[in-house]
């Protein structure tokens, strides 16, 4: 009996180790600016997202830039997104450029819901915010994110990969539906 129990514990340890490797070993390293470039630069963290509702709403998407004119305003857009049969740019974030020429722009929840998920916000009977999904999200693919400053018209671009919902995302969204936080129509 003890030998069989040890075998199960050993197998559990191996499976746990493999799972931890997949979770932590496959994560990409934090993005850094290229020291060789003197002009405007843009990076995004994470550089890949999935379109699961629950996962996307909890995950911060941060655009960082440097090499812009201090005191300027910067707007970050996703280029070439198919919407209504046409390709168009969608606004995701904005920020003020600091005195060092850098900025940090987080994508707000409303932009994630309306632009990336193409969903709506509403309220449930408890007056809690809910996400109402009635259309498919933007198509999966690798897009270009562009930061443009308003006064100086400086520009910088970075790739931004958007993937469809994973199996884990689907499970989280199903649980969100059971909790009344995600409504699919």
Put a short name on every predicted segment.
Residues 26-185:
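Extracytoplasmic/secretory-pathway segments with low complexity and glycosylation-like composition
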């Amino acid at each position: 009996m003890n030998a069989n129990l040890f075998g199960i514990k050993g197998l559990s340890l191996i499976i746990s180790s493999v799972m931890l490797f997949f979770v932590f070993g496959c994560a990409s390293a934090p993005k850094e600016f290229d020291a060789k470039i003197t002009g405007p630069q843009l990076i995004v963290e994470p550089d890949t997202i999935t379109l699961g509702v629950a996962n996307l709403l909890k995950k911060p998407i941060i655009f960082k830039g440097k090499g812009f004119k201090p005191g300027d305003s910067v707007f970050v857009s996703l280029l070439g997104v198919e919407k209504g049969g046409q390709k168009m740019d969608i606004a995701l974030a904005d920020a003020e450029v600091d005195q060092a020429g850098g900025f940090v722009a987080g994508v707000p929840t409303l932009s994630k819901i309306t632009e990336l998920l193409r969903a709506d916000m509403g309220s449930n009977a408890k007056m809690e915010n809910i996400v109402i999904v009635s259309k498919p999200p933007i198509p999966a693919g690798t897009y270009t994110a562009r930061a443009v400053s308003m006064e100086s018209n400086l520009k910088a671009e970075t790739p931004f990969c958007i993937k469809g919902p994973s199996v884990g995302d689907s499970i989280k969204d199903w649980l969100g539906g059971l909790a009344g936080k995600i409504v699919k129509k």
